[in-house]
Amino acid sequence: MQLRARALVNAAGPWADQVLATTKTCATGGTKRQERAILVKGSHIAVPRLHDSDFAYILQHTDRRVIFVIPYEGKCSLIGTTDVNFHCDPAQVEISPEETQYLCAAVSEYFT
């Protein structure tokens, strides 16, 4: 089957490159595009509730990145996110000890 379209939305998330590899041509003169998706891992951690309010907090870490603390599931706080380039199999993604330490250090500056 052959299809023609003015635009194609590749909504495959971290598998976008694999889906793109299955296409034969594109609108750039009949050849495959050479750009690759850049995968970035944004991890979160859930910890025992850090505050009593129903409000979310936005914190700025020493590296100027923004970290949020959101009430989660009643008894927890959701803390995130990290921003780490990722070059492995998306099916094998998991938070690293360094990311956990980063998020804990950021929150420790504001909550005791």
Describe each PLM feature range.
Residues 1-2:
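A structured beta-alpha segment of the ubiquitous adenosine-cofactor-binding alpha/beta core
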Residues 6, 10-26, 31-112:
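Active-site substrate-recognition segment that forms the wall
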